[in-house]
Amino acid sequence: MLVCDADEKNANDKRKMMLDNMGKETDYIFDEDKMTMLFYGRKEVEVYTYIFPDNDGSGNLENLLIDTAKIVYPQLLDFAEEYVGKAATIQTTLMREQDKNKAIVGCITNVMKPGKANQVSIADNDWVSERTIEESEILRRLNQEITKMCRLV
């Protein structure tokens, strides 16, 4: 499964760019029509893609996390947005929306897991839970794609 952020591109443009680059490797042959890769001329596997935040628009993982934070950490989200908004007036690296989103998520995760990476907080806290999968359309779409990829349906 190819998973990456769309960033400023939309998901289809990012997917096309990533898949075009896949065809340049020498160890496998990528068949875009079948969405399969043939490794060393022997093993054919399906290729799945998911482009954050929602497999459709622009953005990144942090857009998805902010969506789930609205559900499980609304007060921390409000504080983080206020802090990052004020910091953006003096820190020019926070001018782009995606950079602000990364900073907002970083603030929340560092409150819950001081000094730990976002991945640790995602694993240990409630960003992804039955509740957020049920209430967040973005997360529900990701869950459906992973379920389909793993052939659990």
What do the predicted segments below correspond to?
Residues M1-A11:
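Acidic beta-strand-to-loop metal/phosphate-binding motif
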Residues V3-D5, D20, E137, Q144:
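Small/polar/charged residue-enriched interaction surfaces, especially the RNA/DNA-contacting tracks
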Residues G23-D27, Q119, R151:
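Glycine-centered secondary-structure boundary/capping sites
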Residues N110-E130:
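Short helix/strand-capping connector loops at secondary-structure junctions
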Residues D124-V153:
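Charge-dense, extended regions
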